[in-house]
């Protein structure tokens, strides 16, 4: 994924009303840009943070600019535009860059499914194997106190994410393949686990999903201000495998 036209940069002034962000440009001008991320954005949205934003050519947009990248105090690049996770996952699957998801004849997006009025992010289909239902989640939360690059999901309580896990378990029970794909969009994260300290219910549901046969994949693309490209999978640490008292 190449950012075209190239991203422009500035300094974060404030994020407010969830979707709005004020950015000061190098010439001193302050502009308001759109923020697609509705999460807590812990460690990504401190005033003074260096940010990069894209510009839409759509004249009907009220806010033509969108916040794409933040640079952490440690120099890590973080893609904060949650829509990019789905876009990049689709690109990588179409490029056969994600080995566990290769070999399907068709890929569809936003297909209605399940019993809770859901739409699956990605649906892989083939005439010779069960369909593969993929929910994509964007991971940007790094615990800066840890030196081992531990990332967490979610960064806030997520009832929507819980619904998606229930739907995936139902698809698996119906004989399909079900995958929870974490797209790790923080260059400082090298492994991850459920954020039981933030959303214990979601963490419990992940354990139930694993037991039910839902696959957990964590993929970390290379995140930069010019592009995001294929890199590697990273380990996922299930909470029930952690030593007692480690949370």
From Swiss-Prot:
Family matches, as CDD domains: SfsA-like_bacterial
Coiled coil: none
InterPro entries on file: SfsA, SfsA_C, SfsA_N
An annotated Gene Ontology molecular function: DNA binding
Pfam families: SfsA, SfsA_N
HAMAP family linked: SfsA
UniProt similarity note: Belongs to the SfsA family.
Name listed for the protein in its UniProt record: Sugar fermentation stimulation protein homolog
């Amino acid at each position: 994924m190449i950012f075209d036209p190239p991203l422009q940069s500035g300094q974060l002034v404030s994020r407010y009303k969830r979707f709005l962000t004020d950015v000061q440009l190098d010439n001193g001008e302050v502009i308001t840009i759109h923020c697609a991320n509705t999460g807590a954005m812990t460690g990504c949205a401190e005033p003074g943070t260096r940010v990069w934003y894209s510009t839409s050519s759509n004249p009907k947009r009220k806010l033509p600019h969108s916040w794409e990248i933040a640079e952490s105090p440690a120099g890590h690049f973080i893609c904060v535009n949650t829509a990019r996770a789905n876009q990049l996952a689709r690109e990588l699957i179409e490029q056969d860059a994600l080995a566990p998801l290769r070999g399907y004849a068709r890929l569809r997006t936003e297909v209605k499914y399940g019993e809770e009025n859901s739409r699956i992010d990605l649906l892989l289909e083939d005439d010779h194997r069960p369909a593969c239902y993929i929910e994509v989640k964007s991971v940007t939360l790094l615990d800066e106190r840890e030196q081992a690059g531990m990332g967490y999901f979610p960064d806030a309580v997520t009832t929507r994410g819980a619904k998606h896990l229930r739907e995936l378990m139902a698809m698996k029970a119906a004989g399909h393949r079900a995958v929870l794909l974490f797209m790790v969009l923080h260059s400082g994260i090298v492994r991850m686990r459920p954020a039981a300290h933030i959303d214990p219910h979601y963490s419990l549901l992940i354990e139930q999903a694993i037991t039910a046969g839902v696959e957990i994949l964590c993929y970390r693309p290379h995140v930069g201000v010019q592009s995001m490209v294929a890199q590697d999978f990273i380990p996922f640490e299930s909470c029930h495998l952690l030593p007692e008292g480690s949370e």
